[in-house]
């Protein structure tokens, strides 16, 4: 996946997909009552980016739905997966379940159109804090109680705090998650981070008893770092410049081994060479 980073205004969906992204990441901020409120990052953010673009969350979902509904004038066939970077650190730990419930209601209504020809993209719920794992259970319970448990087929998970791989595995056990796991690793583009933990995540993904299905690395803006990440075997790279990732994927060394994922690829299935 060529993942566009920090896509928080509806107009940016077109912008990033047109540069080559087949996936986007969107920040979600919550109000004091754990309602998803804005798609907003705020200051500070990645070097070279405007930190303050925003929409109301439900309005963003409607724009995203149009971009991922075949036949809509705004439809992008290429856009197959969306990562919601859930900014839950503003919440108390005991609000995580409520945040999940409210998130599910918002998505059901505004993105999935109550199960009636809604947006088709796969969704990854990315949570920054292992203590907030009940967001997942709250989300699942709500889709089930609202009569749409089948939509969970479209939902995956990520814990984005660069925690020990073993601790993440234990947390998924507590949350009752047995698949659909993306593991992120990374740091803001203003700083450098090695690939040690990415390699551990890839090893877990490729082992017979690992919990990880896919690994992505963030935020990569340079060709050299893109090559290093691909050499380490990642499934996705998050970037401020999707055209840079697309260019590297076109280099002869990588063209033979990697391709841009399409909607027919299963994002929850570990790729076997």
Swiss-Prot record:
Alphabetized UniProt keyword annotations: Cytolysis, Dermonecrotic toxin, Disulfide bond, Glycoprotein, Hemolysis, Lipid degradation, Lipid metabolism, Lyase, Magnesium, Metal-binding, Secreted, Toxin
Subcellular location: Secreted
GO molecular function: lyase activity; metal ion binding; phosphoric diester hydrolase activity; toxin activity
Summary of the tissues where the protein is detected: Expressed by the venom gland.
Required co-factors: Mg(2+)
One of the GO biological process terms: killing of cells of another organism
Keyword Disulfide bond: yes
Protein name: Dermonecrotic toxin LdSicTox-alphaIB1bii
């Amino acid at each position: 996946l060529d993942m566009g980073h920090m896509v928080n205004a509806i107009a940016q969906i077109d912008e990033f997909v047109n540069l080559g992204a087949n996936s986007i990441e969107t920040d979600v901020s919550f109000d004091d009552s754990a309602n998803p409120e804005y798609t907003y990052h705020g200051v500070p953010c990645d070097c070279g980016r405007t930190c303050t673009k925003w929409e109301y969350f439900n309005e963003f979902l409607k724009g995203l739905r149009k971009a991922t509904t075949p036949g809509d004038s705004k439809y992008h066939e290429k856009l197959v997966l969306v990562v919601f970077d859930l900014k839950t650190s503003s919440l108390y730990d005991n609000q995580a379940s409520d945040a999940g419930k409210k998130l599910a209601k918002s998505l059901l209504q505004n993105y999935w159109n109550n199960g009636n020809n809604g947006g088709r993209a796969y969704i990854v719920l990315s949570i920054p804090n292992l203590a907030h794992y009940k967001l997942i259970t709250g989300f699942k319970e709500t889709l089930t109680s609202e009569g749409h448990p089948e939509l969970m087929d479209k939902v995956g998970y990520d814990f984005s705090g660069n925690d020990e791989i073993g601790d993440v595995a234990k947390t998924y056990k507590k949350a009752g998650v047995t698949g659909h796991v993306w593991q992120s690793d990374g740091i803001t583009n203003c700083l450098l981070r090695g690939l040690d933990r990415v390699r551990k995540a890839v090893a877990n993904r490729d082992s017979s008893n690992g919990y990880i299905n896919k690994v992505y690395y963030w935020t990569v803006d340079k060709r050299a770092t893109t090559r290093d990440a691909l050499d380490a075997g990642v499934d996705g790279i998050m970037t401020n410049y999707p055209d840079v990732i697309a260019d590297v994927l076109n280099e002869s060394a990588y063209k033979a081994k990697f391709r841009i994922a399409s909607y027919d690829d299963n994002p929850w299935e570990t790729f076997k060479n």
